[in-house]
């Protein structure tokens, strides 16, 4: 660029500037690269350490679960439980513990006294799968789909129930030694009693229970006597043919919302029920609904126990489609033609149209002194429940001939 000294000098300065910028960029790149590599290296080391610790924790917990289950099998607990199984396998790493137990069996005495040790229940399953998240051992899921057998045995009688289901799933949340929440779901559930041959089928069954806010002790501030809400939903129920005397053998649906006060323990024996009753325990039937063909029953009420620990029921019930029920009671000989005619006349006079447009009638449904009544009409006398001998009733008292 002779003849243009300024242009030559500018080009030289531009080249030097570019070289300087490249050197600065290269130096910064090395510094940043070293810092980034160091941070990545530290992160990888921390991640690797956490992974190793978690792996040790997971497999250590797996070994602990196996030892606890084996201990339960080899050494019966003080509660009288004995357990056995054919094979156990724990998988699910890293997100859960999936405990698969082949041919599990649990056996326990219904009573703790020595004179009543001959009364026991036995559960046998084909396969049980328990799933637990590593970060919360208080929440777990149990899958009992397939075949299950439950036997109640004592010196006088025995019951052998067999269930087959497409799905049986239980989700539970525990707090301390209590079940805070329990969710049960079953699909295509078939239950049969081996000795009587009676069989029940339920297309869908849902059961949910959870503790609600506890009552507070004003003097100590300690919470006590927790209440519990219970929700039951059953659909597509097929009853034994013997029950078709009064109702259709098929029940379309049963819905029920209950609130149990004063901490009723799940084991129904003489001591627990007496304590619950004396503490003022009642079951509030907040709502219920049952549909069988054209007959629909719904309402609310209360359930308690009398001095003999027999049920006391008081329900304000609404009936829709009750006339066919009167005809059926007459057909089976439960009421005569004159009584049926009088019942229809009275029911027609007090019936009102419901929100659905169907005619319905409101009548009290009660159980007192074991007598089940609808309005002024007594339907039947219920068998006496002897809680002192467990929850089982003599077979001859409950068979429907």
Write out the residue ranges for each language-model feature.
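N-terminal beta-strand/beta-hairpin edge segment
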Residues: 78-218, 288
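N-terminal type II signal-anchor transmembrane helix
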Residues: 28, 32-70
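Flexible, membrane-facing loop/turn or short amphipathic-helix motifs
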Residues: 105-120, 148-161, 188-200, 236-249, ...
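Short, hydrophobic/aromatic-rich segments at coil-to-beta transitions
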Residues: 180-183, 227-231, 280-287
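Short helix-loop boundary/capping segments
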Residues: 247-255, 259-268, 293, 307-309, ...
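Loop-centered beta-sheet repeat module
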Residues: 188-254
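Extended terminal
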Residues: 7, 14-17, 21-44, 86-87, ...
């Amino acid at each position: 660029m002779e003849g243009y000294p300024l242009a030559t000098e500018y080009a030289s300065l531009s080249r030097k500037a570019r070289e300087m910028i490249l050197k600065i960029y290269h130096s910064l790149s090395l510094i940043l690269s070293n810092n980034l590599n160091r941070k990545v290296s530290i992160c990888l080391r921390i991640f690797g350490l956490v992974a190793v610790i978690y792996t040790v924790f997971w497999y250590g917990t797996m070994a602990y679960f196996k030892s606890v289950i084996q201990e339960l099998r080899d050494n019966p607990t003080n509660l009288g439980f004995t357990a056995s199984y054919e094979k156990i396998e724990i998988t699910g790493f890293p997100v859960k513990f999936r405990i698969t137990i082949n041919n599990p069996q649990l056996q326990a005495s219904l009573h703790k006294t020595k004179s009543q040790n001959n009364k026991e229940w036995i559960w046998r399953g084909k396969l049980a799968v328990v799933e637990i998240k590593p970060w919360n051992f208080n929440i777990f899921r149990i899958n009992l789909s397939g075949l299950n057998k439950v036997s109640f045995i004592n010196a006088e009688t025995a019951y052998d129930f067999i269930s087959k289901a497409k799905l049986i799933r239980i989700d539970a949340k525990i707090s301390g030694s209590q079940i805070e929440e329990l969710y049960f779901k079953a699909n295509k559930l078939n239950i049969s009693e081996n000795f009587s041959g009676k069989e029940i089928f339920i297309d869908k069954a849902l059961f949910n229970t959870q503790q609600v806010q506890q009552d507070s002790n004003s003097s100590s501030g300690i919470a006590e006597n927790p209440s519990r809400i219970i929700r039951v939903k059953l659909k597509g129920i097929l009853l034994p043919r013997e029950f078709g005397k009064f109702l259709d053998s098929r029940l379309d649906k049963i819905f029920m919302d209950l609130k149990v006060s004063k901490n009723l323990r799940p084991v129904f024996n003489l001591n627990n029920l007496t304590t619950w009753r004396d503490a003022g325990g009642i079951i509030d039937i907040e709502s219920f609904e049952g549909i069988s063909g054209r007959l629909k029953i719904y309402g609310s009420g209360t359930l308690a126990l009398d001095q003999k620990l027999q049920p006391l029921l008081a329900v304000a019930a609404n009936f829709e489609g009750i006339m066919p029920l009167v005809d059926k009671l007459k057909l089976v000989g439960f009421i005569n033609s004159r009584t049926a005619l009088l019942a229809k006349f009275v029911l027609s006079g007090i019936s009102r149209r419901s929100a659905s447009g169907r005619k319905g009638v409101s009548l009290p449904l009660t159980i007192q002194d074991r007598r089940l009544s609808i309005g002024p009409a007594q339907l039947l006398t219920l068998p006496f429940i002897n809680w002192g001998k467990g929850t089982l009733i003599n077979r001859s008292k409950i068979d429907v001939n």
